[in-house]
Design a protein with these regions (language model features):
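Short, compositionally biased low-complexity segments
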Residues: 23-28, 74-75, 118-127
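Bacterial Sec-dependent signal peptides at the C-terminal "C-region" and cleavage site
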Residues: 16-33
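Short N-terminal segments immediately surrounding and downstream of signal-peptide cleavage
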Residues: 28-48
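Short N-proximal segments of mature Sec-exported proteins
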Residues: 46-106
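Generic short amphipathic/hydrophobic targeting helices enriched at N-termini
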Residues: 11-17, 115
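N-terminal Sec-pathway targeting helices
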Residues: 2-13
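Compact alpha-helical subdomains of small soluble proteins
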Residues: 87-166
Length: 166
């Protein structure tokens, strides 16, 4: 009887593990989808982040993903500008919302030839790769590059928003 009970427990644990892991994989795949539904708020977040980074003098090119000190110093990284815009538009920060994901996708597209370098640099610092921070901190990233990924993300969200209205 106890052997049967152990097998049943083992099978139950195995099934639950598959369900949980499968759910996380599906969730991650949905987050990384490039055709998520967009809203006017997504567009406003991108526009606000772009406005916050009005010129190179307010850009912090050494992001650590801690934004309070950036705000106090009057400079923002790409990540911190998006975080501030997110909070202003949504009332809270949502790490994986569509607006931020679109910027991540624009970064992936702009840095296809440097993806390996970004991952290696992150691993050397014993951290997981963070596309927004890693792109911001690449030595060859210029302020114009930051503005360009915001522009690309804004155009993509705007185009999808217009298509959804038709």
């Amino acid at each position: 009887m106890t052997t049967m009970r152990r097998r049943l427990t083992l099978v139950t644990v195995a099934v639950l593990t598959v369900v949980v892991v499968g759910g996380r994989v599906r969730q991650q795949m949905a987050i990384e989808s490039r055709d998520q539904a967009v809203t006017a708020k997504d567009l406003r977040i991108l526009q606000k982040a772009d406005a916050l980074l009005k010129n190179a003098s307010v850009w912090n090119r050494h992001d650590d993903r801690v934004c309070d000190d950036d705000e106090a110093g009057g400079k923002r990284s790409l990540f911190c500008a998006l975080q501030k815009a997110d909070r202003e538009i949504l009332g809270e920060y949502e790490h994986r919302n569509v607006a931020l994901q679109e910027v991540r996708f624009a970064i992936q597209d702009a840095t296809r030839d440097r993806q390996t370098e970004m991952v290696i640099r992150a691993l050397r610092q014993f951290s997981l790769p963070h596309r927004l921070m890693d792109f911001n901190n690449l030595p060859e990233t210029r302020f114009e590059d930051v503005k360009q990924v915001l522009r690309v993300a804004t155009e993509r969200v705007g185009a999808r928003l217009n298509r959804s209205k038709q």
